[in-house]
Amino acid sequence: MKVNKLKIGTSDSKYEIIIGQKILKNSSQYIKKSCPNVKKIALVIDKNIPQNFVNILKTSLKKFKVYSFKYSVNEKFKSTHNALKLAETCLSKNFNRNDLIISFGGGILGDLSGFAASIIKRGINFINIPSTLLAQVDSSIGGKTGVNSKFGKNLIGAFYQPKLVISDVELLKSLPKREMVCGYAEILKHSMILKSNFCTHLF
């Protein structure tokens, strides 16, 4: 499958979304281009991701000092406590502003990991590797990060753009039907807002 690259630009940030099949193995080269001075990586992993994909990513990152964290992810996980715990752990490993947090999971994990990256030393590098269709087409793009409060969802957060998004469509083969339906619903919503001919193409 051809590798596609989309360039995203905001008033204060530019980054690429790399889309392709079986591109996890090339993660290291993409990271070196977007974060050339990184030495330490906090790899934050959703426990639902099959181990073979985790192994592929870790093999690609073997030249970096990688600290791995696996979590069972749900809405309760998306808390200030867990975001601060991740941030404090990175600080305990002497992360500096050149170092990196990678989120390898769905939207909840990306939101929390990105928020943690935004508050460590006022912002360290963040890369999103979304593992669900919904995250690939929606939550990994746009820089919205945050956690839940006792007063409601996503009330504590920041707009913090990633340095890179790596969307490997091979990951989608491991998803249950419900996860795929959620992703397609978001695609349909976007298509209806943007272009009617794209909406027709979906059917």
Residue map of PLM features:
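ATP/NTP phosphate-donor binding region
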Residues: M1-L100, K189
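A glycine/threonine-rich phosphate-anchoring loop and its flanking beta-alpha core
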Residues: G9, G114-F203
